[in-house]
Curated annotation (Swiss-Prot):
Region annotation Disordered: where it falls in the sequence: 1-92
Organism per entry: Daucus carota (Wild carrot)
Gene: EMB-1
Xref: Pfam families: LEA_5 (PF00477)
GO terms, biological process: response to abscisic acid
Main location: nucleus
Annotated protein name in UniProt: Protein EMB-1
Length: 92
């Protein structure tokens, strides 16, 4: 655990706009960044539970293909990469 002095230094850096917690981008203080990172982690885990491991993996493949010019689906189609969107369905 960080000492009180380290926490103060990290908080000061966060208030200057620096991201000091992985996943805490956008937080205006150390505490805010910690809460953002925790929420993002839980959100991803919940989505993975909803889709299942295979669906989550397929969605990541599709998202990883996207760029500024085209979506992941467009690029996959253009390059002949098969994305099985049937795996995207939430489990019931």
């Amino acid at each position: 655990m960080a000492s009180q002095q380290e926490k103060k230094e990290l908080d000061a850096r966060a208030r200057q706009g620096e991201t000091v917690v992985p996943g805490g981008t956008g937080g205006k203080s150390l505490e805010a960044q910690q809460h953002l990172a925790e929420g993002r982690s839980k959100g991803g885990q919940t989505r993975k539970e909803q889709l299942g491991g295979e669906g989550y993996h397929e969605m990541g493949r599709k998202g990883g293909l996207s760029n500024n010019d085209m979506s992941g689906g467009e690029r996959a189609e253009q390059e002949g990469i098969d994305i099985d969107e049937s795996k995207f369905r939430t489990k019931k």
